[in-house]
Amino acid sequence: DGTRIAIGEETALGSQNVKINARGSGQVRIFDYSESGWVQVGSNIDGEGAGDLFGWPVSLSSDGTRLVVGADDNDDKATNAGHVRVYDYTASGWSQICSDIDGEAEADKSGFSASLAGDGTRIAIGAKYNDDGGNNSGHVRVYEASSCSQVGADLDGATADDNFGYSVSFSDDGSILAVGSPNFDGNGSNAGRVYIYEFSNGSWSQVGSGIDGGTAGDTFGQAVSINSAGDRVAVGAPGNGAGHV
């Protein structure tokens, strides 16, 4: 009835502007709920450098033992290319399990969105300003979480300024992926669109037609969430005159 929420065993909280390593480096903390309330699990996880905004997106596996964190303004590959890190929780605490997943090019902001499949096997990473399909068309890449190796080809935005990858959401087993493209112009300027993809036979294929925003300016797809089975999706359209989902 909407009065109770299950978050697995842990909740991850991101703090973009924390100044532990440098101003705006960011930080993530993880908490367990017990009879005494919310208790931190493991140490703080700090961003790498000034302005990284580490902790902008965070995503936990269903059992709370695997964590994905984005830092969309990280500069390791190029200025504001962004990166994502993957952590596992063991008796010794939170440990990074594979190399950083860096954005492709300057100003891509890879890691602006990130979704970890509920079973912890795959990660979807959005880079809303990537230019592969046109200036700021955006793209999404999917990775095996345990190895940080890419799964299938890039998923690119259709046209310039679509901001494809602004939001991403995985089904529980990582086989079905929802991607928001809030500035797509199908039903008017910035009406928005959401795409659904399924992984089969080594590649990603679109499922049905895109789901379009109703009117110009809706920015339909700024937020997207797909259920564990991958057969129902909720989409936010904050630019709609009434504001709707």
In which residue ranges do the predicted regions lie?
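Conserved beta-strand/short-helix segments
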Residues: D1-V245
